[in-house]
């Protein structure tokens, strides 16, 4: 399984409240600044590489329609295929936030919404071995799918060789995070797949523990992949 790096921000804009009809000129709309921030990000999308994903929601846009909002809050997350590129997108996000605040005479702050998730440093010997074990235990093995999510296993993979195989628990084409997928986890096929995965991971762990040459090969492959990530 491949994963994307991820960073989450809570972006808060502060302005000046005023009555939207009686004295709108006295206000500085934090909501307008928040909307402009999202507009600026959208203006950058045509130049995004395919791996860059930026998603956001406005969590607070004011309390009443007849009051110019003095506070607005956005929760956003963005993903890329490497930590190096994540930092580049981070700079773009901050520029858009500061530009929007400046244009609307507001202030802005960015706070981490959660800890960063790193992308996956893939290790070819581990992927090859786990594929062989899964096949030996009767599980159909396919190619590694393009990354569509994030996992803290990516963080682990920047510290030591790691792997996170993805198992199919049903023959039906079900979307994740749905009630249909939840129900599929209760069926015998799902339990058989999980047992197959556990047995395969156990076999791989024993190979790592008992085969010094294999351990060395895994570590060398990991170091090579890590250097490539650092040079992106």
Please tell me what each predicted stretch does.
Residues 1-128, 132-134, 145-154:
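Midchain, well-structured core segments that form catalytic/ion-binding scaffolds
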Residues 102, 135, 223-227:
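Generic surface-pattern signal
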Residues 136-141:
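Acyltransferase
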Residues 142-200, 204-212, 216-232:
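Zn-dependent metallopeptidase/amidohydrolase metal-coordination segment
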């Amino acid at each position: 399984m491949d994963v994307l790096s991820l960073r989450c921000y809570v972006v808060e804009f502060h302005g000046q409240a005023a009555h939207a009809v009686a004295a709108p000129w006295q206000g500085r709309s934090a909501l307008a600044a928040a909307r402009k921030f999202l507009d600026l990000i959208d203006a950058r999308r045509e130049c995004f590489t395919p791996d860059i994903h930026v998603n956001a929601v406005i969590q607070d846009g004011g309390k009443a329609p007849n009051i110019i909002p003095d506070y607005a809050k956005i929760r956003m997350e963005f993903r890329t295929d490497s930590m190096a590129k994540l930092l580049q997108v981070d700079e773009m996000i901050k520029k858009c936030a500061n530009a929007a605040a400046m244009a609307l005479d507001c202030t802005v702050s960015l706070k981490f919404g959660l800890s960063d998730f790193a992308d996956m440093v893939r290790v070819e010997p581990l992927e090859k071995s786990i594929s062989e074990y899964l096949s030996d235990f009767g599980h159909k093995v396919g190619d590694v799918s393009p990354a569509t999510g994030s996992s803290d296993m990516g963080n682990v993979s920047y510290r030591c060789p790691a792997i996170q195989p993805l198992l199919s628990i049903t023959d039906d084409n079900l979307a994740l995070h749905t009630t249909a997928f939840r129900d599929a986890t209760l069926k015998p096929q799902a339990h058989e797949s999980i047992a197959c995965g556990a047995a395969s991971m156990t076999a791989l762990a024993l190979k790592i523990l008992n085969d010094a040459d294999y351990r060395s090969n895994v570590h060398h492959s990991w170091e090579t992949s890590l250097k490539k990530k650092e040079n992106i």
